[in-house]
Amino acid sequence: MQEFTNPFPIDSSSLIHCMTNEISCEMLANGILALGCKPVMADDPREVLDFTKQSQALFINLGHLSAEKEKAIRIAASYAAQVCLPMVVDAVGVTTSSIRKSLVKDLLDYRPTVLKGNMSEIRSLVGLKHHGVGVDASAKDQETEDLLQVLKDWCQTYPGMSFLVTGPKDLIVSENQVAVLENGCTELDWITGTGDLVGALTAVFLSQGKTGFEASCLAVSYLNIAAEKIVVQGMGLEEFRYQVLNQLSLLRRDENWLDTIKGEAYE
């Protein structure tokens, strides 16, 4: 597995602006705090630029989209592109909503650092057959061979952008690097917002100077390894959710956590 540099300790002055949905807002805020950064959630078009200007990274999640939120997203993304602010776009629900898919394609013009989605969402976005329903991926969409080739082509069209594709095996693709990561546990599917949290953690690592590829690999591995440490037979849903956030704050103390990343990376 490729050697990554430990991103901890985190610069505690880093502000991460999350434009996310109301369902996962609290989890993302606590997850960002657990890693040592400061979260802010502002999606009113009248103030979004003020908060984006103060931020060290921007995370855009399309959950609970509205006309007003779309306006705010476009304002923030435009500014991020102008000043080269690291930006993560999470293509939530593009399998179902033509409005969201159109918005994501517009946001590509602002050159996000990372474009994230589950297997079905990314397959839909790049024009491949998919079976996604709502905001969930389908087990029928986990084949990566055809997707990988298309993503490599897209990375040439959008240089500097990385794809983070979540699934039983997570796929990260940049212009000249590919990683297939295998940490994680099915229990993460028990609770809502864990996919959103991966996007927020990616923004955290981007704020520390990591590339899109590095930040994506670190973020998805960090959450998955944290979850692996707390899987206990018979644990209830709410207890698991609590322990996920708890472990996020503890894992960074382990200087050897990077050694537990499972998977492969290649050029």
Swiss-Prot record:
Substrate binds at M41, G193. The keyword Kinase applies. GO terms for molecular function: ATP binding; hydroxyethylthiazole kinase activity; magnesium ion binding. Pathway: Cofactor biosynthesis; thiamine diphosphate biosynthesis; 4-methyl-5-(2-phosphoethyl)-thiazole from 5-(2-hydroxyethyl)-4-methylthiazole: step 1/1. Its EC number is 2.7.1.50. ATP binds at K116, T166. Signal peptide: none annotated. Pfam families: HK. GO terms for biological process: thiamine biosynthetic process; thiamine diphosphate biosynthetic process. Catalyzes the phosphorylation of the hydroxyl group of 4-methyl-5-beta-hydroxyethylthiazole (THZ). This is Hydroxyethylthiazole kinase 2. It comes from Streptococcus pneumoniae (strain Taiwan19F-14).
